[in-house]
Amino acid sequence: MLIDAHNHPNWHGFNAEKILRNMDEQGIDQMWLFSWEVPEDEYAPSYHAVLPPTGLGIPLEDVISVGRQAPDRFVMGYMPHPKRPDAIDRLKAAVEIHGIRLASELKVRLSFDDPDALRLYEFCGEQKLPITIHLDYPIDHGK
């Protein structure tokens, strides 16, 4: 089985139909779909070249919308920002209500050992949710 273990809904305009077609063309059996919850002060406007300009990052709603169109092919991921006071409650609800199976993607300007992050990681461990962490470096986002 070939798994694409890092992807996002609506990235470069790829909706469910385009993603599934691309998966079939490339022989990909399953894809992990990630949200990206990002504070406004961490979001570069250049991301609007590759994401819909309707908001910031990739909301859980987009993951659910695409993921539910082919639940046998998409594994849905969500990771709230660890500094949100309700981060654990939000992740727990996403798991219980929407079937989230991954804690993904953590891409924030925060130390790995931040106390709020550690609490969230501990919850993920208790829930047996794999965590993906995006390490970033300066790249051209298509300015």
Model feature map: region roles:
Residues 46-143:
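Active-site gating/metal-coordination segments in enzymes
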